[in-house]
């Protein structure tokens, strides 16, 4: 199982600390976690190709005001080329009204709300170990078919 933590930064010199923090908190799953940082100035095709080539089963995006439009645009194409991949988001641009975000973004599997470390670790248990269910993970809003469930 491969889990990709993806960040789309405003500039090349910027770094997204959130994805590094999530990876460090879930260090027991280090061999399953991939990390990629991109910029919103890279071509969409370049990023799509790189994400595709990771072979990730789950892709988690860190979403902020400067990248949310870019992430949504990427997601539309990613879902077409990786229809079996699960897509998750976290960050201030998606967590304040996660249900509305999921209704507007049908390609997204779920949103991690609030502080993401414990939630991400629980998602790792779920996806990598096959333990529990999404209904048991606090701090997520997720899609189950046409229904949206809020465990926030």
Q: What are the functions of these language-model segments?
A:
Residues 1-20:
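A short, flexible N-terminal coil/short beta segment enriched in small residues
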Residues 2, 18, 25, 29-152:
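Glycine-rich beta-alpha loop elements in corrinoid/cobalamin-binding modules
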